[in-house]
Amino acid sequence: MKLSRLLGLGLLLVLPLFVFAGAIERSLVYSVRIAVLDTGDFHFKRSSTHSRYSFSGHFETKGLINKYYRWKGDFAAIGSLENGSPKMEKYFARSESKDHELKLVVLKAEGVRFLPPGGKTFQFSDRPKGDDLVTALFLTPRCYDGKHINDGEDTFEMFLTKVREIKQEKEKFGPIFKCYYRVKDYRGRFRRLNVTLASSAHGPITQEVRVKLPLLPDIVFDLKTHK
């Protein structure tokens, strides 16, 4: 598949953000840090109706972390809403890093087409199981109860181990649930993952995603702005 055609497929995922009739649009920004180190801001926009949703996002590392690792990427997805929970149908990602040149991923019902880092030939693989990471962790209005998530290429097993309800004070915005997960990657390694959901004028919203790595500082996505 030619590069221009694959990029065109990616644009098809982004365009629905602007064409949903009567859609509600929201913009969210999360600060991303490792311990006290600010590594950049994760921006994304969501558009939704009663039955459909789409999002597009961008992240680029900044500051001191760039001396050791540099990464930037754009991504988008479209899907359906079932009882208020999003179910991803198509996904697109474009990324570059210090370790690799341009990488492209287009996920559809029939499978995944991707350009490996630094590669010149597009490859095809089976569609991974579950929803993409953003849909599952940042857009689901309750604890994600699916058994799998994916990064557009690889499947990760997801285990919801505990749900803790947080008694809300009088403020209009505050945490209401904390979801605890164990995640198993394709290499058999386990990680812990905590997601805090908060109330807002638009309904439940992800306030924090915390990735807990053995012997390493947590990676934290903390809600900075939402409108």
Segments from the language model and where they lie:
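Hydrophobic alpha-helical transmembrane segments of integral membrane proteins
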Residues: 12-13
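Acidic, serine/threonine-rich low-complexity disordered tracts
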Residues: 22-108, 143-227
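N-terminal signal peptide c-region/cleavage motif recognized by signal peptidases
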Residues: 16-18
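Bacterial N-terminal signal peptides that target proteins for export
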Residues: 1-8
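Hydrophobic, well-structured mid-protein blocks that either form specific transmembrane helices
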Residues: 96-138
